[in-house]
């Protein structure tokens, strides 16, 4: 698939964000990892690095059963654009609400995702999550 404009990039990014949001809100770590490439890199808000979709899923399973149990997230696409054939970069705003734990309350973050076309699907290959200070 050859992308030619921003609307194409948005059409690629939005379903991925929907899948991430639905999985998070269901507390489904492996579902959250679903749109990630097998060899994806994920940098989380504290700077930790997870390599591979399986690691992303396991990491999220762990936080959904502990510090983020019962949390919800809302993802909003700020911008998506193509940067080359089969490559989309998406900037995303995240609002996560945690009922308890060290992140209790409303937390905002910004994410940068590199989404690539591989094996006839679009997958996140790079993901960087940065906590936004109040």
Q: Language-model features: where?
A:
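Short beta-strand segments enriched in hydrophobic/aromatic residues
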Residues: 36, 94-96, 128-129
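Short helix-adjacent coil turns
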Residues: 20, 27-28
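Short beta-strand edge/turn micro-motifs at domain boundaries
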Residues: 108-134
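A short hydrophobic beta-strand element
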Residues: 85-94
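A solvent-exposed, acidic/Ser-Thr-rich amphipathic alpha-helical stretch
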Residues: 10, 16, 29-86, 105-107
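Beta-strand elements of well-folded, non-transmembrane domains
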Residues: 96-100, 115
